[in-house]
Amino acid sequence: MKHSEFVAIATRLMTAQEPFLVIGPPGSGKTAGLVQASLAAKRRVVITHPIISEEVDYRGLPGFVQRNGQTEAVFLPFGFARDLTTTREPTSVIVDDVGQVRLSVQAALMQLIHLGEIDGTRISDTVTFALASNRREDRAAVQGIVSALVDRCVCVLELEVDASELASWLLTQGYNPILAAFIRWKPDEVRFDAKNEFQK
């Protein structure tokens, strides 16, 4: 789908707080489109890159809490995870480059997205998730996405680069009009095929 269609659908999904996945080639505007959709839905944006995470990061750090006059040892969310459990602000969490993430970390993400909790600690009801990934054929280090994680999403959107929309966007962002004119003249040049390019 075109970028404008993608942003419109993503905005509706975020407003409804439904988790979803978007896939597309590198540099096609997946993350930027998700940020745009979040802002259109009047939601705070949190971008996370779980490629740098360990599966145990989501469990938290060991600590102690007082319950009913008793001291209990528990795992307490910290950093990003703590923010998700305490925020009251409508928040869209963009899980970026999820296809590059180790499968064990993807499995840990399933609790957040499906159950809305981290090892028994509830995520705020105001939080929703949007996942983004390149495709395996893009040769962007995508090893695949755990099917159970994909099943936690209500839909998978496939973003394609549209030369006309790209040219219009470049003009609105102040890029040289010659670049936009070139893209309109040679629209196929914006479609990078990693498989064929690396075999030349």
Feature annotation, model-predicted:
Residues M1-K200:
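C-terminal regulatory/interaction module of P-loop NTP-utilizing enzymes
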